[in-house]
């Protein structure tokens, strides 16, 4: 503390005290100050000056930590008032002083004057006159006018009973200092982020101070919210080593705040560290430190900063651009996007989980946009390993994922949003940093109506904010708002941060589950128009729906239309997509994907798919597809109330000659009439063997003529398997894959995997016999290439009875199935294809010996009803079936009882 001030303020060697100048850095007590010089390329030197001939009371002192024999000492009477009197007069101001005496220990005594010369106020005299200091009379010399004046001023103060000389001893002037706070978090919360008057008593470094809170005299250490400046590292020997610019940052804060009157907003208290913002009439020290390159923004405390985090980011950005101090080596990331690609307006077409959306640009291009700097809900810890055998569905099985997706879906689907690209996350390989491979991601801030969607999601506790390395600039342009939103969500216990039991969504996926679909079908059919959400679009007419009321997922086929089919992986190889199948699927996606719709369930096919009409905002999707020349009317629509509308829409599309009708040429009416009259019912009966009858009265049959080929193939295949048995458990079944399966009789048969519930439960379909079974994967093996479906196609073909309707009543349907099983199971019959169905060919079946029609027999026995066809060439058969139905009705047989 005895280091010299700069040369211009050095004392001369003359006998008379030389007048020196400096700036008051700190007031130690009522009779001691620290002065400093002007900075020259760094913090300036400083020295302590004690006022000559007077003594003020000693301030309170805390016991030395680690020394149990020391204890706290309180203020002496009027000591704090003397310190405050002098602090308010001289702190931060220029003073001139003389050094009259210097002790062997290096303590300097002298006179201090406010201003640039001795004409200014004598600080010692002012203190004595106010009764805040006593004169040391033992050293007074009568021939010294300044000392005599001090004595006169003291006498006047005594007679006026000022300060130390007042009655009562001054006990009321002793502060009740509080060095510790029992519960800092409660203390901070009790202030409700209101400004508190304070005096900065000590500066630890650029962003940490010790403050005296008024009027209750709490001494607290406060770290500035949102920033971190270079610090002093404590070494093993107790010394401190400053980081680059640590001393400069400390001086910057000291010169502006030390012993100044300020207001402090105490904002948070994580881990017993009090975070706050210091308000001074001349500016915000937090922003100034950033702007001058003495500090950097820190995310962990930025969230609690109450004065606008964007100001801090802007100040830091300014320092980076100017490359000042800690940013002298800063290299800005290169921008690789044009302005038009950085900001654009797009329409939201799909929400992907809870952190990404698919948008349609003005150019018609589709683009996936990930919300910047947020992470969707995910499974943590033991939940990841729970129920490994269960099919994992992230949307329903991850807590709050469904709520997050629904929030985005309801807010965004079909609406235009503003997209500001923040950064592009490069693609990662699976080997990098032990993380899964990800493609390149465009990360952006998405707003609608001025609302930041990511921030809204985080504020509801439906997503969390990603934490970055401090030097990682690839983050949201509104990162601080995201952190603040997360802090609010945590404080209010929202969503993921709630202590309540997590919501569970028990959603039954009955798509492809025939038995389950049968259970739901009566309820959906009776419900009439039901609300649904389109979860997925497989093709123009095939969708997956979520039924909120029934909490189930169903596969849905549009009724009344014939839509082009997309490419499919078939047993004989990849089936090429039909023309305009992609356009039809895109049309359906744009119109209904993830929208709320209404459906009317009419029927169900053998595979458990529901055949229905779908409406969205008053638009019938079947009609819309036909109207846009992306589908044709199917004959099954004839029985529907929408038939006329569909025919009209198709005629309109034909006239426009668009898409499916581009090559359509209208033929003369006469020719059409002749063709209609000429068409007759086909009579090509083929001998076949019925193998398996389903609950929906469909059946699987083998062509008798190819039976020998199948027998030869099976014999050869089993011989090869016997010679080279498959390794048990080596086959990993996948849905849709062909394999061989060991049936209950111990023999191997060709099969197709329909569903994998777990290794112990694999659903297979025997492609040559039409039956199904659930068995362990240990009873499955890869299908030898020599016996694939290319060598011999699947021999079991699915058919349905023509001209009949299966009863909806389960008991009646079971009776009909039993009757058919008794009559035709494993029996050779003659099969004739009458017309095409939605799922499979519709046929009549005759007994090979008697030529009796099996379906007609069911009608005669009152087991089934007649399906009335409108085609003219079928009317003879329809009439025969209707006559049989009338006979059954008259006799009140079975369903007509």
Swiss-Prot record:
Keywords: Cytoplasm, Repeat. Gene3D superfamilies: 2.30.30.140, 2.40.50.90. Residues 18-167, 194-329, 342-499, 528-663 form the TNase-like domain. SUPFAM superfamilies: Staphylococcal nuclease (SSF50199), Tudor/PWWP/MBT (SSF63748). It comes from Danio rerio. GO terms for molecular function: nuclease activity; RNA binding. Its main location: cytoplasm. Coiled coil: none annotated. This is Staphylococcal nuclease domain-containing protein 1. The gene is snd1. It holds the Pfam family SNase. CDD domains: SNc, Tudor_TDRD11. One of its GO terms (biological process) is regulatory ncRNA-mediated gene silencing. The keyword Acetylation does not apply. InterPro entries: Silence_cplx_Nase-comp_TudorSN, SNase_OB-fold_sf, Staphylococal_nuclease_OB-fold, Thermonucl_AS, Tudor, Tudor_TDRD11. GO terms for cellular component: cytoplasm; cytosol; nucleus; RNAi effector complex.
């Amino acid at each position: 503390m005895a280091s010299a001030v700069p040369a211009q303020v050095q004392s001369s060697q003359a006998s008379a005290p030389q007048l020196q100048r400096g700036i008051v850095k700190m007031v130690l007590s009522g009779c001691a100050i620290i002065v400093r010089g002007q900075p020259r390329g760094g913090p300036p030197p400083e020295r302590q000056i004690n006022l000559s001939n007077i003594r003020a009371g000693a301030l309170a002192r805390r016991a030395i930590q680690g020394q149990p024999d020391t204890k706290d000492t309180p203020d002496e009477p009027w000591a704090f008032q003397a310190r405050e009197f002098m602090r308010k007069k001289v702190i931060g101001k220029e003073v001139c002083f003389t050094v009259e005496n210097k002790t062997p220990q290096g303590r300097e005594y002298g006179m201090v004057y406010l201003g640039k010369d001795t004409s200014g106020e004598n600080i010692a005299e002012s203190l004595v006159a106010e009764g805040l200091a006593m004169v040391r009379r033992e050293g007074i010399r009568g021939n010294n006018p300044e000392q005599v004046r001090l004595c006169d001023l003291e006498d006047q103060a005594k007679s006026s009973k000022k300060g130390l000389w007042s009655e009562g001893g001054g006990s009321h002037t002793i502060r009740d200092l509080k060095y510790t706070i029992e519960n800092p978090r409660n203390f901070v919360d009790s202030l409700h982020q209101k400004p508190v008057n304070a005096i900065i008593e000590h500066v630890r470094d650029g962003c940490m101070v010790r403050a005296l809170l008024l009027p209750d005299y709490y001494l607290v250490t406060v770290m500035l919210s949102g920033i971190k400046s270079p610090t002093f590292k404590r070494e093993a020997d107790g010394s401190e080593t400053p980081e680059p610019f640590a001393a400069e940052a400390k001086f910057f804060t000291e010169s502006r705040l030390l012993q100044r009157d300020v207001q402090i907003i105490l904002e948070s208290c994580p881990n017993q560290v009090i975070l706050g913002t210091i308000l001074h009439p001349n500016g915000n020290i937090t922003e100034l430190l950033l702007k001058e390159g003495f500090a950097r923004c820190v995310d962990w405390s930025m969230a609690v900063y109450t004065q606008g985090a964007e100001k801090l980011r802007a100040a830091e950005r300014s320092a980076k651009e100017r490359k000042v101090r800690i940013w002298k080596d800063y290299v800005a990331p290169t921008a690789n996007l044009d302005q038009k690609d950085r900001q654009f307006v797009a329409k939201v077409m799909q929400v992907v989980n809870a952190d990404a959306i698919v948008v349609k640009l003005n150019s018609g291009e589709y683009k996936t946009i990930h919300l910047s700097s947020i992470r969707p809900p995910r499974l943590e810890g033991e939940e990841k390993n729970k129920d490994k055998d269960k099919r994992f569905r992230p949307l329903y099985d991850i807590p709050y994922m469904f709520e997050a997706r629904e929030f985005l879906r309801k807010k965004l689907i079909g609406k235009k949003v503003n997209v500001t690209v923040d950064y592009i996350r490069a693609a990662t390989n699976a080997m990098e940093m032990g993380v899964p491979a990800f493609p390149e991601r465009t990360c952006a801030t998405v707003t609608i109506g001025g609302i930041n969607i990511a921030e809204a999601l985080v504020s509801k506790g439906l997503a969390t904010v990603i934490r970055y390395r401090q030097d990682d600039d690839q983050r949201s342009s509104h990162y601080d708002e995201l952190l603040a939103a997360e802090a609010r969500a945590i404080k209010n216990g929202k969503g993921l941060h709630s202590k309540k039991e997590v919501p569970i969504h028990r959603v039954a996926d009955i798509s492809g589950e025939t038995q389950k679909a049968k259970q739901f079908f009566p309820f959906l059919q009776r419900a009439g128009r039901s609300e649904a959400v389109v979860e997925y679009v497989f093709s123009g007419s095939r969708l997956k729906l979520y039924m909120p009321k029934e909490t189930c997922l169903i596969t849905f086929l549009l009724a009344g239309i014939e839509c082009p089919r997309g490419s499919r992986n078939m047993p004989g190889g990849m089936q090429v997509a039909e023309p305009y199948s992609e356009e039809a699927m895109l049309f359906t996606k744009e119109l209904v994907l993830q929208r709320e719709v209404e459906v009317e369930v009419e029927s169900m096919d053998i595979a458990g798919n529901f055949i229905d009409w779908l409406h969205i905002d008053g638009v019938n999707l079947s009609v819309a597809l036909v109207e846009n020349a992306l589908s044709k009317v199917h004959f099954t629509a004839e029985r529907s109330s929408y038939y006329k509308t569909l025919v009209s829409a198709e005629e309109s599309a034909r006239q426009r000659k668009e898409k499916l009708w581009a090559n359509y040429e209208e033929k003369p009416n006469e020719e059409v009439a002749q063709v209609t009259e000429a068409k007759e019912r086909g009579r090509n009966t083929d001998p076949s063997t019925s193998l398996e009858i389903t609950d929906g009265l469909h059946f699987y049959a083998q062509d008798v003529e190819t039976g020998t080929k199948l027998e030869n193939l099976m014999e050869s295949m089993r011989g090869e398997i016997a010679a080279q048995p498959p390794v048990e458990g080596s086959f990993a079944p996948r849905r849709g894959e062909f394999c061989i399966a060991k049936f209950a009789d111990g023999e191997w048969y060709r099969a197709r995997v329909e569903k994998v519930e777990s290794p112990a439960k694999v659903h297979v379909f025997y492609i040559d016999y039409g039956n199904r079974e659930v068995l362990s994967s240990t009873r499955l093996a890869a299908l030898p290439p020599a016996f694939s479906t290319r060598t011999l196609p699947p021999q079991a073909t699915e058919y349905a009875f023509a001209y009949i309707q299966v009863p909806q009543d389960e008991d009646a349907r079971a009776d009909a199935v039993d009757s058919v099983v008794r009559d035709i199971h494993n029996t050779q019959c003659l099969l004739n294809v009458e017309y095409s169905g939605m799922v499979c060919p519709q046929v009549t079946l005759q007994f090979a010996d008697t030529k009796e029609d099996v379906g007609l027999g069911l009608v005669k026995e009152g087991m089934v009803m007649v399906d009335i066809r409108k085609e003219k060439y079928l009317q003879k058969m329809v009439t025969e079936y209707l006559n049989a139905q009338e006979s059954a009705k008259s006799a009140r047989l079975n369903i007509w009882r």
